[in-house]
Amino acid sequence: MHASTGKGSKIKYSRVLFKISGEALMGSRPFGHDMELIDQLCKDISDIYKLGVQVCIVVGGGNIFRGASASLSGCERASSDYIGMLATIINALILQNFLEKNSVNSKVLSAIPMVTICEPYIRRKAIHHLEKGRVVIFAAGTGNPFFTTDTAAALRAVETNCDAILKGTQVNGVYSADPKKNEDAVMYDRLSYMDLLTRDLKVVDASAISLARENSIPIIVFSLKEEKIVNIVKGHGTYTIVSDCE
């Protein structure tokens, strides 16, 4: 495992995309938002922001609505996905409010234009905001149905030239099996993109893995509860890194 080596370490990743699932915003709740957890999460983002790291965020909407699940219940898949995209905009605006509360200048850019509440997604505008020291929150996924927010995260990371994708989850890395169900599950320190695909380790979807692989962007999977983001950007802490290792 990767071990932390102290506060004085240099920054390893200067521009990162932080992928936050909607479920992560629920905390221990069955749905909705755990505002204390969100506040702490934004304080953690503030820590790396103050170090000069340029931060993008893609947030999911599963704490409010899951398009794939709704389609199984009879709702048309495309319509379900659009509703899910609207849920991500709600989450993005909540994150923006808590970031601003923690003195972090932030902008929400939506793939579905909603100009009265946020900016439309324009790649050059997003990069401009990052260069000006603003956290950029990408909402509404890719703006297209049938694509997950994991794929949106990989796409935005490629478009904005990020050094890494940080995927915060409920466990501290990628395991050989579900550690909650199998006590013999082994956590991987490092995997290749192909390992994720061939071993069917359902941490990130195949489209997102392909985009990251084609553009050599590492994916770092870590626990939102147990690990500080500031450790991750310094290359320390406990996590699994998915990269071009073979």
UniProtKB/Swiss-Prot annotation:
Q: In which pathway does it act?
A: Pyrimidine metabolism; CTP biosynthesis via de novo pathway; UDP from UMP (UMPK route): step 1/1
Encoding gene (name): pyrH
Q: Which family does it belong to?
A: Belongs to the UMP kinase family.
Gene3D superfamilies from the xrefs? Answer: Acetylglutamate kinase-like
What species was this sequence derived from? Wolbachia sp. subsp. Brugia malayi (strain TRS)
Residues bound to ATP: K19, I20, S21, G22, G62, R66, T169, Q170, Y175, D178
Purpose of the protein: Catalyzes the reversible phosphorylation of UMP to UDP.
Where on the tree of life does the source sit, at the highest rank? Answer: Bacteria
Under the GO molecular function aspect, what terms does this record hold? ATP binding; UMP kinase activity
Report the activity regulation comment: Inhibited by UTP.
Q: Where in the cell is it found?
A: Cytoplasm
| Catalytically driven reaction(s) | UMP + ATP = UDP + ADP
Kindly list the positions annotated as binding UMP.
G61, D81, T142, G143, N144, P145, F146, F147, T148, T149
Taken from the UniProt entry, a GO cellular component term is: cytosol
This chain's protein is named Uridylate kinase
Annotated GO biological processes are:
'de novo' CTP biosynthetic process; UDP biosynthetic process
